Design a protein with these regions (language model features):
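C-terminal membrane-cytosol helix-exit motif in multi-pass small-molecule transporters
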Residues: 1-17, 201-209
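Structural signature of the two symmetry-related core transmembrane helices
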Residues: 101-116
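Helix-loop boundary and gating motifs at the non-cytosolic
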Residues: 36-75, 141
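A membrane-interface helix-boundary motif in multi-pass transporters
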Residues: 1, 178-198
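Helix-to-loop junctions at the C-terminal end of transmembrane segments
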Residues: 85-99, 183
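Juxtamembrane intracellular "pre-TM" segments in multi-pass secondary transporters
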Residues: 10-46
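Intracellular juxtamembrane helix-capping segments at the cytosolic ends
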Residues: 138-152
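A late C-terminal transmembrane helix in Major Facilitator Superfamily
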Residues: 157-185
Length: 211
């Protein structure tokens, strides 16, 4: 919902008209696109997939630490508010940032956020962790939209589809299964693992910055 609100405030990827003759459909076009963008896709899959433990088990973990259901709801709401604010101010805040720089910022926020959640359940730190949702999720999504919008022609639509299916869907689904196994055996240690999952994104960022 918060991502939808942010996108309504300002669409990140504007549609571009082109003739049917320019479109190249078929498997070769998709294969070429993935070959050119695999670093980007791997990076965003790690950053978005690292949210799996948070989405699936943070409420259970916090309630087990003594927080009421309403307190957990407020913490989740704080993350949503931070997300919407950054979406609304993104043009002003990140005007000079390319996709590569935004992905670095998101990765740093990811390591910090999941590390905090694995380290403590003290309320002040959980508030910080929830505010960092604007970095782990929103900044990553903004970087993806900036990278995708720099593509040419029908590649924009194709890469948007791959990003939505793989990074926003598949990676989170797979990591949720993995996180469930880890939470059963490691408890809060699953968040440390998520911090480690986000870390390689620093090196996997696409080499060419897309503005």
């Amino acid at each position: 919902l918060s991502m939808l609100l942010g996108m309504l405030l300002r669409p990140s990827v504007m549609p571009q008209g082109e003739s049917r003759q320019q479109e190249s459909a078929g498997w070769p076009a998709w294969r070429s696109l993935v070959a050119q963008s695999w670093r980007f896709l791997a990076c965003v899959c790690l950053l978005q997939g690292a949210h799996a433990a948070y989405y699936g088990f943070s409420a259970i973990y916090w309630q087990g630490a003594g927080y009421s259901a309403s307190a957990v709801g407020y913490l989740w709401s704080l993350g949503v508010v931070a997300e919407v604010i950054i979406f609304a101010l993104s043009n002003r805040l990140f005007r000079r940032f390319g996709a590569r720089e935004l992905l670095l910022l998101s990765a740093i926020c990811g390591v910090a956020r999941w590390g905090i959640m694995g380290w403590t359940t003290e309320l002040p730190w959980l508030i910080v962790a929830q505010i960092l949702h604007c970095g782990t999720f929103t900044v990553c999504h903004l970087a993806a939209m900036r990278y995708i919008s720099a593509r040419k022609g029908s590649d924009v639509i194709r890469l948007q589809a791959v990003y939505s299916a793989v990074a926003m869907g598949g990676s989170i689904a797979i990591m949720t299964v993995f996180a469930g196994f880890l939470y059963q055996h490691l408890g809060h240690g699953v968040f440390w693992v998520m911090a480690l999952v986000a870390l390689p994104a620093v090196l996997l960022r696409p080499r060419v910055a897309a503005h």
